[in-house]
UniProtKB/Swiss-Prot annotation:
Note: The basic functional RuBisCO is composed of a large chain homodimer in a 'head-to-tail' conformation. In form I RuBisCO this homodimer is arranged in a barrel-like tetramer with the small subunits forming a tetrameric 'cap' on each end of the 'barrel'.
Positions where N6,N6,N6-trimethyllysine occurs in the chain: K4
Source species: Humiria balsamifera
Protein name as catalogued: Ribulose bisphosphate carboxylase large chain
Gene Ontology molecular function terms on file: magnesium ion binding; monooxygenase activity; ribulose-bisphosphate carboxylase activity
Annotated residues for binding of Mg(2+): K191, D193, E194
Annotated site (Transition state stabilizer): K324
Subunit structure and binding partners: Heterohexadecamer of 8 large chains and 8 small chains; disulfide-linked. The disulfide link is formed within the large subunit homodimers.
Keywords tagged on the record: Calvin cycle, Carbon dioxide fixation, Chloroplast, Disulfide bond, Lyase, Magnesium, Metal-binding, Methylation, Monooxygenase, Oxidoreductase, Photorespiration, Photosynthesis, Plastid
EC number(s) from the headed UniProt entry: 4.1.1.39
Protein's UniProt keywords contain Electron transport: no
Top enzyme class: lyase
Ligand binding (substrate): N113, T163, K167, R285, H317, S369
Length: 465
């Protein structure tokens, strides 16, 4: 028969508006900004083609396979309200296009080449629907929310953390001292900063030893289980696992990884190691804003959050809504639910484009961190609820009397907010009053209230629908 060589419009093959999506399809919602003169159907079809089976011209080898079985399909396009020349293109991918249990492969396919495509001015992946048929091929988080609570024996309240500052420059012994004071004062966790790996002023092994010592001393004195996120992120996967092994040998409860800079392959390996060896895994999202901050290009953080739940992590940073970093309330709560819950309904007002069913994959605890202090505590308790980690770096270490009193202030504020909430008080309305009352019987909290009474980070949010 021969085949018809030449270049033909993508939309003839890849735009299929009458396609019925299958339960096993991976669905993607892209925000497409076509170049002038490119019709939206062609742009949407081009995205489907270039992220699945297509190439720029008809090829003879197409005849050796069944394109109908394997091609991505753009099945719906809608204009974005209030934006000129922007469309949401919905693409369905057959499950067979993806390697099982590999976030790396999923992203290489869906967001690999297509983002440099000339016919598009910009392209953003807004959401993915991961079908159970695919999510069940992943281990997911090493432990999940309930197992973590049981390991730590902490229930009915958010957990408290603190990133040790100055993030770079402390010796291991001084670093360990800062860890001890924070944990002794009443925090549940302290944290290595994301860029603390193994630098000349503090090699990883020394830090691990001094932090473990700090942890056990604080545990003995408070009778509570304590943790310090030991950052295992390293230049090679082998070195990363070596650090995790040493953490396990020290008997500490939790390690940490920078999952975007470290990469999904490394992260998934570490998550498997953590489940096999009883370590919790804290995930930092360093580099996320490079990918997710532009409104019209890149990937929304909710996609990176879903990818992390597949790859594996027990905590992940998720913005604060109130501090110094990005995060609009409804949108943030949208992906917080995607991290914690088993079943999340489609809700476009929160940026959730698809109903997501995680079946039995464990949940991830969202971490609120960045520019928050005691006055934010009522809002954070209300917004994030019990299954969260509230992390105050400067908001602990910046206390005028030092780290331990800073930790005391945060713990007192948190306990006051939880108690008030359980008594039925309205944290949003009475928050300041609740903190003021509590500070009457806690000099540490009173001092903290005084220092940060006027601090706000007020800028318009970038992350809008």
């Amino acid at each position: 028969v021969g085949f018809k060589a030449g270049v033909k419009d993508y939309k003839l093959t890849y735009y299929t508006p009458d396609y019925e999506t299958k339960d096993t399809d991976i669905l993607a919602a892209f925000r497409v900004t076509p170049q002038p003169g490119v019709p939206p159907e062609e742009a949407g079809a081009a995205v489907a083609a270039e992220s699945s089976t297509g190439t720029w011209t008809t090829v003879w080898t197409d005849g050796l396979t069944s394109l109908d079985r394997y091609k991505g399909r753009c099945y719906h396009i809608e204009p974005v309200a209030g934006e000129e020349n922007q469309y949401i293109a919905y693409v369905a991918y057959p499950l067979d296009l993806f390697e099982e249990g590999s976030v790396t492969n999923m992203f290489t396919s869906i967001v690999g080449n297509v983002f440099g495509f000339k016919a598009l001015r910009a392209l953003r992946l807004e959401d993915l629907r991961i079908p159970p048929a695919y999510s069940k091929t992943f281990q997911g988080p090493p432990h999940g929310i309930q197992v973590e609570r049981d390991k730590l024996n902490k229930y009915g309240r958010p957990l408290l953390g603190c990133t040790i500052k100055p993030k770079l420059g402390l010796s291991a012994k001084n670093y360990g001292r800062a860890v001890y004071e924070c944990l002794r004062g009443g925090l549940d966790f302290t944290k290595d900063d994301e860029n603390v790996n193994s630098q000349p002023f503090m090699r990883w092994r020394d830090r691990f030893l001094f932090c473990a010592e700090a942890l056990y001393k604080a545990q003995a004195e408070t009778g509570e289980i304590k943790g310090h996120y030991l950052n295992a992120t390293a230049g090679t996967c082998e070195e990363m696992i070596k650090r995790a092994v040493f953490a396990r040998e020290l008997g500490v409860p939790i390690v940490m990884h920078d999952y975007l800079t470290g990469g999904f392959t490394a992260n998934t390996s570490l998550a498997h190691y953590c489940r096999d060896n009883g370590l919790l895994l804290h995930i930092h999202r360093a580099m996320h804003a490079v990918i997710d901050r532009q409104k019209n290009h890149g990937m929304h953080f909710r996609v990176l959050a879903k990818a992390l739940r597949l790859s594996g992590g027990d905590h992940i940073h998720a913005g604060t809504v109130v501090g110094k970093l990005e995060g609009e309330r409804d949108i943030t709560l949208g992906f917080v639910d995607l991290l914690r819950d088993d079943f999340i309904e489609k809700d476009r007002s929160r940026g959730i484009y698809f109903t997501q069913d995680w079946v039995s994959l464990p949940g991830v605890i969202p971490v609120a961190s960045g520019g928050i202090h005691v006055w934010h505590m009522p809002a954070l308790t209300e917004i994030f609820g019990d299954d969260s980690v509230l992390q105050f770096g400067g908001g602990t270490l910046g206390h005028p009397w030092g780290n331990a009193p800073g930790a005391v202030a945060n713990r007192v504020a948190l306990e006051a907010c939880v108690k008030a909430r359980n008594e039925g008080r309205d944290l949003a309305r009475e928050g300041n009053e609740i903190i003021r009352e509590a500070s009457k019987w806690s000099p540490e909290l009173a001092a903290a209230c005084e220092v940060w009474k006027e601090i706000k980070f007020e800028f318009p949010a970038m992350d809008t629908l």
